[in-house]
Amino acid sequence: MSICHLFTGRYKGRTSHNMIEGHGDDAYRYKNPIRADFSSNVLYGPLDAGLRVHLQEKVAAVTHYPEASAQSLQAVAAEAYGVASDQVLVTNGVTEAIYLAAEAWRYLKIATILTPAFAEYEDACRLHGLDIHWQSWNSLTPDTRLPGGLVFLCQPNNPTGAALPPAHLHRLLRGHPDAVFVIDESYIEFTQATTSLLPHLMLPHMALPYVAPHAGDYPNVLVLRSLTKSCRIPGLRIGFAIGQSSLISRLRECKMPWSVNRLAIEAGLYIFGHGQQFWPPPEQLLAETAAWQEELRSATRWRVYDTDTHYFLVETPVAFTAAALKEHLITRHGLLIRDAGNFRGLTPYHFRVACQSSEHNRLLTEALRECSRTGL
């Protein structure tokens, strides 16, 4: 089922949508023991054993300053992503890159954000004085005319899990050559519904056998990538901004030194040095997600939204809000969900969950079955 609680409009000033006031993985707010955490989009499972040992061996490195701009990780990431080193900026998670983009292009005066959306896009634009144009994800077509300026688009989207078809996205990009697009690919490893834009950011003259026919197509596109989600390290904050060198240079002018800590750099070097073990094919995860969605629909009769990833939205009945459901689940069952009420374009009745192990999925299914029958 598609997202329908969306709107287009204009916004100035502060709202209650600030992400720092509500986000996933907020178990620290509760004294109750957590049996299962569905609130974060991070891939379920333990920290990679090899990475754990590596970080333990490198912990003494924190007695020294990190590289001012994480140069070693920048070079390794560039090779992994198939671009030149000066096309990459290492950031303290994707969140830092979002705020840097809003600062670097604040002179454009206006930003477009597709809704529903990760609230950090709004927070960053508001901080740097950009007027915001809201564009409904559902009403976006290849021929939609955006007002230009800075455009934030999450591909696949958070919190809906929906992805724009590649042809749709490319037509949109080519139709707005004067806008600066920030394409957040934080969850690209978790979908088969779209492909990364990175091959289109390669320099045409790069002597690589796999350079795409349209390499260098988009001098106005900044792609954001993350190691947080697929590598299960949200506490270390490792992100990347990737684009043509002119875009990266503008971002770098706004970036403070030493924003990426020593252990984060070490983790990134280890991850890129150990290849695809950190990026398993998504087929099994997506199949588990689809099966669990059907179980939830059958158990609750609630609205469970379609997704192209391993996370998705659910809408509660009007008898209780997602916030009330969240409190009930954590206090009665030790289960944590993501109240999605602070995502612009959603309602107080939306919550988001991410697929976990089959055992944990069953725990939430049964708890929600009980709520659907007896209330809170």
Regions found by a protein language model. Give the residues of each.
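Conserved active-site segment immediately N-terminal to the catalytic lysine
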Residues: 196-228, 246-250, 351
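Active-site phosphate-binding strand-loop segment of PLP-dependent enzymes
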Residues: 133-193
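N-terminal "arm"/small-domain region of PLP-dependent enzymes with the aminotransferase-like
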Residues: 2-64, 354
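Phosphate-binding glycine-rich loop
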Residues: 66, 70-110, 128
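Conserved PLP-anchoring active-site segment centered on the Schiff-base-forming lysine
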Residues: 104-126, 131, 138-144
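PLP-dependent enzyme catalytic core of the Aspartate aminotransferase-like
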Residues: 167, 331-332, 342-376
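Conserved PLP-binding catalytic core of the aspartate aminotransferase-like
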Residues: 286, 299-333, 355
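PLP-dependent aminotransferase class I/II
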Residues: 48-50, 69, 220-298, 302-305
